[in-house]
Amino acid sequence: MKKINKQALIDLVEQKQLKAYVPEFSAGDEVNVAIKLKEKEKVRIQNFTGTVLRRRGKGISETFIVRKTTDGIPIEKNFQIHNPNISIELKRRGKVRRAYISYMRERSGKAAKIKERKQ
């Protein structure tokens, strides 16, 4: 019997959990995250559309932060990219020079706009 080390076993299990397709996006992009919520027997989809502040990690633990403003109240949510209960749709590409645009937290209104990246 072949002996497998712990890390190889972990990698093997994680590989099965990864999504087959994840859209390519980065900080500054506008995405729509459709979250499947199960309420008793009923399953409903809640959309969360906003700007990606950061994408970090790799493999099964890769995450990203999305920020949106609703009625003047800013909301930020952390999502796991390979979560089977979410689907990610890229709305538009944003032009930023940083991997983590934390300065967007202090901005509101017109100052919070991000230029669109040309293809």
UniProtKB/Swiss-Prot annotation:
Q: What's the protein name? A: Large ribosomal subunit protein bL19
An example Gene Ontology molecular-function term: structural constituent of ribosome
* PROSITE patterns documented for this protein: RIBOSOMAL_L19
Query: PANTHER family in the record, alphabetically?
Result: LARGE RIBOSOMAL SUBUNIT PROTEIN BL19M, RIBOSOMAL PROTEIN L19
A GO CC annotation given for this chain:
cytosolic large ribosomal subunit
- Tell me which domain of life the UniProt entry assigns to the organism this sequence originates from: Bacteria
Q: Which GO terms describe its biological process?
A: translation
User: What's the stated role of this polypeptide?
Assistant: This protein is located at the 30S-50S ribosomal subunit interface and may play a role in the structure and function of the aminoacyl-tRNA binding site.
Question: Does this entry carry the keyword Ribosomal protein?
Answer: yes
Q: Which UniProt keywords apply?
A: Ribonucleoprotein, Ribosomal protein
Question: To which protein family does this belong?
Answer: Belongs to the bacterial ribosomal protein bL19 family.
Q: Which Gene3D superfamilies match?
A: 2.30.30.790
Coiled coil feature spans: none
